[in-house]
Amino acid sequence: MRRQVRSGTVRAMEGEDGYFGERIAATYDDPSSELVEPGVVDVLAELAGGGRALELGIGTGRIALPLAQRGVPVHGIDLSRAMVARLRAKPGGDAIGVTVGDFATTTVHGTFTLAYLVVNTIMNLTTQEEQVACFGNIAAHLEPGGCFLIEVMVPDLRRLPPGQNVVPFHVSQQRAGFDVYDVATQAMSSHHITFVDGRGEHLSIPFRYVWPAELDLMAQLAGLRLRDRWGGWGREPFTSQSRQHVSIWEKPTG
């Protein structure tokens, strides 16, 4: 990339709001931000089946609000007070219950027919132990017959050049982005560089990528069983070429 910029690196630091503080919350709903795919709310409303839904990483309510408008009672868990404040400021946001905390371990009152984690949010838990704990926590909150849905990418390690660990995912005049992988630990960090008036600002956020079969084992350890796995929200088949999956595990009734 032939662009000269003045130094302006800012690394996201863990604090009260984790890596998703006011700086990210302020632009999370910008028109250029990743949008919710069509069909998401339809699928979630169907799975809720008239019961309560629990959203992990509820954020600014981009999914919870339209789901609540469909008549589904939604409760959310989120570590970021800055994100929750944005939710509260939206029409209808004050009617959605939110518990502030780490969704791997935070408990809430009551049980749910549906719990869900979308847009790669399971990867915000940066250790395998935390991801396993999340499944156990959700299983304890589900009613018998209730479902746990996760939407997450399939790790695209085929794009890694031999001997390298960096994969670019966006390049434009305004911003650039790349992921750095550690295939030994499944740790990755997502780097975002924004160019404003010739100045570059750098943001880095850690994640842990996870394989479908690994998620199935986590579910099994929590007493859940796989019900469906699709290649996307259109319920297309999941294949070796799929770049994401929507997986649903069910809590047995017996």
Write out the residue ranges for each language-model feature:
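A conserved beta-strand element that flanks and buttresses the S-adenosyl-L-methionine
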Residues: Y116-V118
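SAM-dependent methyltransferase
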Residues: L149-M218
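A short acidic, Gly/Pro-enriched loop at the edge of an enzyme's catalytic core
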Residues: T107-L114
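Conserved class I S-adenosyl-L-methionine
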Residues: R3-G49, G51-G59
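A short glycine-rich, Lys/Arg-flanked "PGG" loop and its adjoining helix->strand segment in the class I
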Residues: V132-P144
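Class I SAM-dependent methyltransferase SAM/SAH-binding core
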Residues: T60-T105
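C-terminal lobe and adjacent flexible extensions of AdoMet/dcAdoMet transferase-like proteins
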Residues: P212-G254
